[in-house]
Amino acid sequence: MSSKQVVLITGSSTGFGRLFTDTLARKGHTVFATMREPAGRNAKNASEIRTLAQKDSLPIHVLELDVTDDASVARAVDAAVAKAGRIDVAINNAGYVLSGLSEAVTTEQAQRLMDTNFLGPVRVNRAVLPHMRRQRSGVLIHISSAAGRIIAPSMGFYCASKFALEAFAEAYSYELAGQGIESVIVEPGQYETSIFGSVVTGADEARANTYGALKEIPAKVQTALSSTSGNPQEVADAILRIVETPAGERQLRYFVSPQNFGVDEINALSKQVQANILEAFGLAADTKFLKGKAVGSV
C-alpha cells in the first residue's frame, strides 16, 4: 500500500462515518463517503460534506450506496475504482440500533436489522475483494461494538447482528491471510453519536405489555449507557491509526471505549481459544494466525 490510502466508508452521512471521513481526509487520505440517497433524504448531509471538502481542499467524494442493495453497492465500488484506480480500505460502518424486549421485536424488524448490520458488510466485502485481490493488498474494517462481545437485556437483536458481523469478519481474517488482505474488527463502547438518536424499538407493544414492569428495561439500559458516553473522536482517531498501520502489523480486534465492559478479557480468552482450535484443526499454518496479533488497543 502507498502511504496515502483510498478509503471507502459506508454510512458517512452522520455519526462515526462522518467523523471517519473528516479525520482521514484531513490526513491526506482519499475518502469515498457513501450514503443512501445523497440527492434525497441525505441531501443536506451530502451538501455539507461537499462544501467542507471544497472549502478545506479535502480529498472527499460523495457517492450513493445503499448497503441493503447489491446493485447499489456494486455501482459505488465501481465508481470509486474508476475515479481513484483502487480501493485500499473499506470501512463497514453503516448500521443502526434495534432496542426492545426480544419478544416485542417482529420478524420483519429482525430481517431489516440483519440486512443492514450484517448482510450490508457481506455485500460491500464481496464487491471490493476482487479489486483488493488484484492489488494483493487491502484492509476490511468492520465497525462492530462492545455489543458484539457482551449482551444486555433489550439489546438482544442488536447484539445478534454484531455477533454475526464479528464471526464473519474473523473468518475472513483467516481466509484472506495469505492474499495480503487484512480483516479488522473495531469494537466501540458507548459514544455519543446520532445512532442513538434514531434507535428503532420493538414494534409489538402487545407482547411488550405482557412483561409488566420489565417493559421499562430498554429505557433503563439506554439511561445507563448514555450516562457514561465518551468523545466519538476517540474512535475516529483509532480508525486513523489502524488505516496508517503498516500492512501485516494490524491486529484482528481493537476495543475502543471509555467504559470497562470486560471486552478486553473476553477478547484475550477468545484469542487463545481460537489459536488452539486452529492448531487442533491443522490450520494454523494455512491461516498464518499470529497469536500475538489477535487483539489489541490503539
Per-segment meaning from a language model:
Residues 175, 179-225:
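C-terminal beta-strand-loop-alpha-helix "lid" module of Rossmann-like NAD(P)-dependent dehydrogenases
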Residues 101-102, 109-111:
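Substrate-binding pocket helix/loop in short-chain dehydrogenase/reductase
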Residues 56-59, 79-92, 98:
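A glycine-rich helix->loop->beta "capping" turn
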Residues 2-36:
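Canonical Rossmann dinucleotide-binding motif of NAD(H)/NADP(H)-dependent dehydrogenases/reductases
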Residues 145:
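Residue(s) in the substrate-gating loop at a strand-loop-helix junction
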Residues 64-75, 107:
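The beta1-alpha1 cofactor-binding region of Rossmann-like NAD(H)/NADP(H)-dependent oxidoreductases
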Residues 125, 161:
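Active-site helix of classical SDR
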